[in-house]
Swiss-Prot record:
InterPro entries the UniProt entry points to: DTB_synth_BioD, P-loop_NTPase
E.C. numbers: 6.3.3.3
Gene designation: bioD
Oligomer and partners: Homodimer.
GO terms assigned for molecular function: ATP binding; dethiobiotin synthase activity; magnesium ion binding
Descriptive protein name: ATP-dependent dethiobiotin synthetase BioD
GO cellular component, one term: cytosol
Length: 206
């Protein structure tokens, strides 16, 4: 089983869409260990975007009511997120797509952050970067932290309108491989996810 951890440079960068694309492409299982906000969960979004019944969507280890930072959501509910209690699900040999909460330094409790969870799982990261003013800095800071922690990175997915100069300088500084460009879409559907899943393999094995 291969484990890919989907993280991003910020919140609302496109992690769930990219997770759906990867789950589709690899016929993998999906897991969101820590969900903050229960009105529209990422697991339910993934369910609506997959054609195949091959993938299992595993239940969250922590499902917190408020859509705020996980440490705050847990604290407000009188819960403590304990990393040792978050165990990888049994995928019966399937690859596993793990979707993080926010970015790599989002706190899970008073001492642990998302990056500690990545290390615990010994997962390979796929970084999602949506391009906006300031995103170069956010992307390079994320890459620097991943490198400092010796976390393996499979590659980067750029999400949103193309910005060739921003992409060039990010790749120059990080040495990352571009796995996929995701364009703005009027509506995200199963068909859109499937189309990107096919495109993913253009760069996946290089």
């Amino acid at each position: 089983m291969k484990k890919y951890f989907i993280t991003a440079i910020s919140t609302d960068s496109g992690k769930t869409l990219v997770s759906a694309i990867l789950t589709n492409a690899l016929q993998a299982d999906y897991w969101k260990p820590v969900q903050a906000g229960l009105e529209e969960t990422d697991s339910n979004t993934i369910r609506t975007l997959l054609h195949s019944g091959h993938s299992i969507i595993h239940p969250e280890a922590y499902a917190l009511k408020q859509a705020v930072s996980p440490h705050a959501a847990a604290r407000n509910e009188g819960v403590e997120i304990v990393l040792a209690a978050i165990q990888l699900p049994d995928t019966n040999g399937n690859d596993l797509i793990i979707e993080g909460a926010g970015g790599v330094l989002v706190p899970l409790n008073d001492t642990d952050v998302v990056a500690d969870l990545i290390t615990q799982f010994d997962a390979e990261v796929i970084l999602v970067s949506n391009l906006y003013l300031g995103s170069i800095n956010h992307t390079l800071l994320t890459a620097q932290e991943l490198k400092r922690r010796n976390i393996r990175v499979k590659g980067i997915v750029f999400n949103g309108p193309r910005n060739e100069e921003s992409e060039r300088i990010i790749l120059k500084h990080t040495g990352y491989k571009v796995l996929l460009h995701v364009s703005p879409e009027e509506k995200i559907t199963k068909e859109v996810v499937t189309a990107y899943a096919v495109k993913l393999f253009d760069n996946w094995y290089e």
